[in-house]
């Protein structure tokens, strides 16, 4: 696909609007982050958003509108409290969730009966929506799980060749995604913090409940709730400790790894090889604006581990805290805990030694890596089935599994149940985030869908891995995608298990 690069001139916006009208995808600027847009009422166009990003299908999109009248096309019920919020904060960085109109396709809502809507405070975005004559569904315009794009260059790096057009609207003013509040229930619930704070919302609504994650098995009502988000290729670790503890720890780690440190202007000098300031401790807006660019820049500098300080959860700092801690997978290292520090240092040094000493001994057991979206359903079932069959048949091979967007969650209850039916126990499995090291160590990487493969190849462009990453369809030469059973009952999971068993039997018979 050849991607058009467009300006914010009206003549170019008319080209972009025609692309939207014809079912295409256009990246547009907003005041928060750049968005990957499509006609919110066109299910096929919306599907292409998920394909381009490698985004999980149950992760809902936000529909963007250019005027308040458009809200009636999307929302079946708009409570008076929501109208007061719209009067105060629209256009602006606030997304509200409502019960959806029947016309809104489930592809846009992630299968939910609710729709997320906002009116962006960006003239280019609103003009595009106006010219397209339809609400535009748009998540952030990055590969799913990576830091959101806040510049035109970020978009071209991630999405050139994946979308029809990218509009250059300059740098995003705010730099983190919108605040999301659910107005579809009996009481308002804050689902994602942003530039509009809980305190500001409470001035209009009274008490606002805050929920920023979902329970296992639940569908997320808002982007950013379920899957690992905002993550650079480098590991991100939050450090808890005093200045001397942090200095000494960074100095030791810098002898083993290329380390980066996110700091504030008031901080003393650290010995990390790469240091990027998020601005002043007195200015949360500066930290919001700089955070995603800083994470991306650390990757460009070849940093292996990014260390960051603890962040307050007060007012606007809550948004910075949310994004940074999600990027870290909630990993916080307490430097006062000598055992935890020792475990961390031993673990990182062992990884270096393992990488240096590993050989390609042909007599070793072959390693197969199964990959799905969250590593809680399909891939752990595949891992269990493969290892069971290899042991039964005397085949010297071993399987592991990982997810594109995993956060150490337990295996899904239904997956464990249907595997237990055939005598395989996967109940102790915890989801693992896919890493370059996992791919390096595998002889064969089998993924569930073409979208998974595309996401992996795009995310690890620096590695030549297209000779080991396959869908079952590619590897076996027959149409064999494995649909996600997430949200289904045990019958759906049983069907998925049996499909995987059939495919793994064919893989073992073919050899690798």
Features from the language model and the residues they span:
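Short helix-capping segments at alpha-helix termini
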Residues: 56, 390-396, 461-465
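S-adenosyl-L-methionine/SAH cofactor-binding core of RNA-modifying enzymes
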Residues: 244-263, 426-442, 446, 453-454
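Short, well-ordered alpha-helices that flank and scaffold nucleotide-derived cofactor binding pockets
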Residues: 51, 157, 322, 384-392, ...
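Intrinsically disordered, low-complexity terminal tails and inter-domain linkers enriched
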Residues: 336-363
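Active-site-adjacent structural elements in enzyme catalytic cores
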Residues: 1-341
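Phosphate-binding/catalytic loops
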Residues: 363, 444, 450, 454-512
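Conserved active-site segments centered on acidic
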Residues: 361-441, 509-512
């Amino acid at each position: 696909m050849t991607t058009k690069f467009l300006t914010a001139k009206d003549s170019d916006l008319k080209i972009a609007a025609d692309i939207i009208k014809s079912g295409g995808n256009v990246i547009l600027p907003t005041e928060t982050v750049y968005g990957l847009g499509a006609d919110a009422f066109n299910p096929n166009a919306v599907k292409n958003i998920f394909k381009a990003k490698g985004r999980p299908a149950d992760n809902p999109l936000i529909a963007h509108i250019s005027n308040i009248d458009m809200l009636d096309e999307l929302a079946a019920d708009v409570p008076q409290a929501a109208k007061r919020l719209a009067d105060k904060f629209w256009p602006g960085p606030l997304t509200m969730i409502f019960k959806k109109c029947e016309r809104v396709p489930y592809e846009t809502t992630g299968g939910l009966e609710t729709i997320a809507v906002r009116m962006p405070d960006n003239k280019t975005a609103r003009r595009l929506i106006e010219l397209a004559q339809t609400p535009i569904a748009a998540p952030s315009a990055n590969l799913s799980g990576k830091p959101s794009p806040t510049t035109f260059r970020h978009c071209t790096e991630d999405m050139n060749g994946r979308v029809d057009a990218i509009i250059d609207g300059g740098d995003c003013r705010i730099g983190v995604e919108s605040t999301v509040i659910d107005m579809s229930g009996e009481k308002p619930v804050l689902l994602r913090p942003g530039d509009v704070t809980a305190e500001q919302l409470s001035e209009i609504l009274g008490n606002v409940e805050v929920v920023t994650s979902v329970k296992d098995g639940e569908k997320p009502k808002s982007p950013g709730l379920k899957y690992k988000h905002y993550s650079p290729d480098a590991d991100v670790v939050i450090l808890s400790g005093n200045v001397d503890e942090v200095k000494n720890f960074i100095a030791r780690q810098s002898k083993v790894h290329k380390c980066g440190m996110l700091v504030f202007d008031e901080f003393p000098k650290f010995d990390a090889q790469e240091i990027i300031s998020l601005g002043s401790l007195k200015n949360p807006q500066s930290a919001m604006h700089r955070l995603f660019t800083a994470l991306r820049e650390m990757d460009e500098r070849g940093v292996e581990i990014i260390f960051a300080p603890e962040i307050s959860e007060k007012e606007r700092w809550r948004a910075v805290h949310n994004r940074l801690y999600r990027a870290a997978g909630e990993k916080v290292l307490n430097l006062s805990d000598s055992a935890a520090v020792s475990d961390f240092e031993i673990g990182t040094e062992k990884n270096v030694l393992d990488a240096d000493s590993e050989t390609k001994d042909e007599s070793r057991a072959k390693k197969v890596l199964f990959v799905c979206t969250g590593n809680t359903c399909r891939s752990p079932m595949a891992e269990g089935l493969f290892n069971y069959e290899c042991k039964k048949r005397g085949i010297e091979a071993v399987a592991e599994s990982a997810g594109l967007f995993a956060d150490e969650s337990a295996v899904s209850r239904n997956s464990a149940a249907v595997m237990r039916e055939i005598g395989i126990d996967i109940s102790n499995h915890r989801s693992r985030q896919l890493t370059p090291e996992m791919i390096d160590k595998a002889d064969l990487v089998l993924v569930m869908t073409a979208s998974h493969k595309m996401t992996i190849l795009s995310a690890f462009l620096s590695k030549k891995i297209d000779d080991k990453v396959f869908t079952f369809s590619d590897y076996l030469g027959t149409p064999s995608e494995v649909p996600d059973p997430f949200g289904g009952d045990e019958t759906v999971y049983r069907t998925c298990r049996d499909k995987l068993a059939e495919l793994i039997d064919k893989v073992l018979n073919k050899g690798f």
